[in-house]
């Protein structure tokens, strides 16, 4: 056992037990708790870690580029993207026998390979890459970028280059920089790549380092830009007959507003995507000039927030809502946990939206027909969104424990939220019970009547409000005649008066899985409410954890016990499981439960449509046994049969992962149910045996072995539960989809 310990916490170094290891892991990244930590040092360390994070991302991208260029089949994919299965990398495994070697030698490879379900091939193809050489060049560039960002991280820890605390807390300048430079410039730079490289390549015109200065992206050049004749850039778009990657049917437009999908690539029009990026880049650059700069021009955030109150002489409420946002500016500025919570919540919502839109409005050429990749990407992004959202509430709770100042926030919105927490929490509890009892009640009723041979007695509710929303966006099948589904409405007349061709109505009324809004019925209505139950229950646990973080009637001094504590002292057994950490821990189980329902729904509905059997979802999705039998059991069949006495197949690895995932998941329960005393006794018995066994007793250790604390065991249990859950469902999604569609 190590005798030295990192210098960040001398208290750990004195601990005579194996707790040191666990507390070391727990506090390694809790910079605030480290010895000798000042606020300025804290900000500098965090700023430096951002560059390290960027380096890891750049290295990961470089690795993907390198291995696909080296071992993949990108150039073959470019020639036939709808039929060539993309290769992620080769497999070199000394354990492979002839059966598995043969099974994994696929997609035209000469040896065993893994198939890529990441969508990287489609992305690189869409943005104009065509050769392995280009992938290698990009890989080298990303590797250099990783080195450069690592150097930047190191540099900003050196005395001469450490930013000051005042620099970090200059909110207006930081917002201006992030909005205008990071978001604005990068969006316009991406427009540049799309216009100069991707769009010409999609029209069969090669643009590379050899000719990029001589190939005009538009016949008129910059003349329309300087003469304000911007409409010229939208004229002569690609036709509906255009063959992606060739000049056949190609136009010359670079910024369009066509809507819908390119008929052949079944992805958004590249010229629409370019238009989106230049528009949003322009908006961000304008936004990056809103806040007060070093010349005193622009808005002060403090003035804006403090103007948002009810003390204005013309305000009808006359201060009845307290002082609203006074103190909020200082609270957010001085709390990294508050800022992180806001950032995680925003990013969590954005990631969930990305998951939805990658399926509903695919932006990469031909990816919509790679059903396994689409399923994997949806699942991947929804799971990430879940982790980000739980993290947002976790850091919100840490803010209340560590950073909240009751004096500074007296009678403002934060104090008012804390003051009305009983009403908030009890209402959420009521909502979850209403949703839970009604949804489960209808599902179980339907199960019973189907089991007894009376399926016509099911309670089937049409989602009329959601159907109305779909109709308003132009879906004709429901017969609602609202807004865009009514040809005579003001919305339709305005849409029809737009110059040029527009294809939104074609997209929304498609009969396949690419319709922007899929048809919905009673099965969708029920699972929607099941998902709403999961969302509200997760939110209830997390919001309660944050709002109760400082104290409750049961434990008034909770804030002094910290973010994570097992129980409030001996003899007060009723106080266990009440820390904010415990709320996060419990919410994780509900969040995993919820995200499974979300992805089950998306996956099954799409499988049914892709197979031309949409009735399966519509009819079986209205009762629980239908979900268990026709989705879970039916699609597990390939996994359970992945390898058998007659040999193996290309799904074997997923079958093994499916089984292994269940094992990891089940291991979690050992830590979640068996608690400390049992383990402590077992450890002491094992130590006794070790010390009396020849040869083994030559190895000793300094630390007294101690069982995991309740909080530590919960962390280990939750980690196994989560990782097992993801391994199991990931293998299920990929194998069940690729087993049907390749």
From Swiss-Prot:
A cellular component term, taken from the record's GO annotations: plasma membrane-derived thylakoid membrane
Annotated localization: Cellular thylakoid membrane
Listed name of the protein: Photosystem I P700 chlorophyll a apoprotein A2
InterPro entries: PSI_PsaA/B, PSI_PsaA/B_CS, PSI_PsaA/B_sf, PSI_PsaB
Molecular-function GO terms, alphabetical: 4 iron, 4 sulfur cluster binding; chlorophyll binding; electron transfer activity; magnesium ion binding; oxidoreductase activity
Keyword Ligase: no
Record note on cofactor: PSI electron transfer chain: 5 divinyl chlorophyll a, 1 divinyl chlorophyll a', 2 phylloquinones and 3 4Fe-4S clusters. PSI core antenna: 90 divinyl chlorophyll a, 22 carotenoids, 3 phospholipids and 1 galactolipid. P700 is a divinyl chlorophyll a/divinyl chlorophyll a' dimer, A0 is one or more divinyl chlorophyll a, A1 is one or both phylloquinones and FX is a shared 4Fe-4S iron-sulfur center.
PROSITE patterns from the UniProt entry: PHOTOSYSTEM_I_PSAAB
Pfam families reported for this sequence: PsaA_PsaB
General function of this protein: PsaA and PsaB bind P700, the primary electron donor of photosystem I (PSI), as well as the electron acceptors A0, A1 and FX. PSI is a plastocyanin/cytochrome c6-ferredoxin oxidoreductase, converting photonic excitation into a charge separation, which transfers an electron from the donor P700 chlorophyll pair to the spectroscopically characterized acceptors A0, A1, FX, FA and FB in turn. Oxidized P700 is reduced on the lumenal side of the thylakoid membrane by plastocyanin or cytochrome c6.
Disulfide bond sites: none
Subunit structure: The PsaA/B heterodimer binds the P700 divinyl chlorophyll special pair and subsequent electron acceptors. PSI consists of a core antenna complex that captures photons, and an electron transfer chain that converts photonic excitation into a charge separation. The cyanobacterial PSI reaction center is composed of one copy each of PsaA,B,C,D,E,F,I,J,K,L,M and X, and forms trimeric complexes.
Family: Belongs to the PsaA/PsaB family.
Species of origin: Prochlorococcus marinus subsp. pastoris (strain CCMP1986 / NIES-2087 / MED4)
Membrane topology note: Multi-pass membrane protein
Residue spans crossing the bilayer: 46-69, 135-158, 175-199, 273-291, 336-359, 375-401, 423-445, 525-543, 583-604, 651-673, 715-735
UniProt KW 4Fe-4S keyword: yes
Alphabetical UniProt keywords: 4Fe-4S, Chlorophyll, Chromophore, Electron transport, Iron, Iron-sulfur, Magnesium, Membrane, Metal-binding, Oxidoreductase, Photosynthesis, Photosystem I, Thylakoid, Transmembrane, Transmembrane helix, Transport
The reaction(s) this protein catalyses: reduced [plastocyanin] + hnu + oxidized [2Fe-2S]-[ferredoxin] = oxidized [plastocyanin] + reduced [2Fe-2S]-[ferredoxin]
